[in-house]
């Protein structure tokens, strides 16, 4: 999905999450379309130390 793509394209957490407006923003809201549970867990752990 676009969330994973953001990171694989070299985006960082600021870019990919962008305070709730980036392609990974949905991860923060509970894994809707474009982010699987495992993707979000990995990204959130990477970005926020397991938040």
From Swiss-Prot:
The lineage of its organism: Eukaryota, Sar, Alveolata, Ciliophora, Intramacronucleata. The keyword Disulfide bond applies. Mating ciliate pheromones (or gamones) are diffusible extracellular communication signals that distinguish different intraspecific classes of cells commonly referred to as 'mating types'. They prepare the latter for conjugation by changing their cell surface properties. It is found in: Secreted. One of its GO terms (molecular function) is mating pheromone activity. This is Mating pheromone Er-23. Keywords: Disulfide bond, Pheromone, Secreted. Disulfide bonds join 3-24, 6-16, 13-47, 27-40, 35-51. GO terms for cellular component: extracellular region. InterPro entries: Pheromone_Er2/Er23_protoz, Pheromone_Er23_protoz.
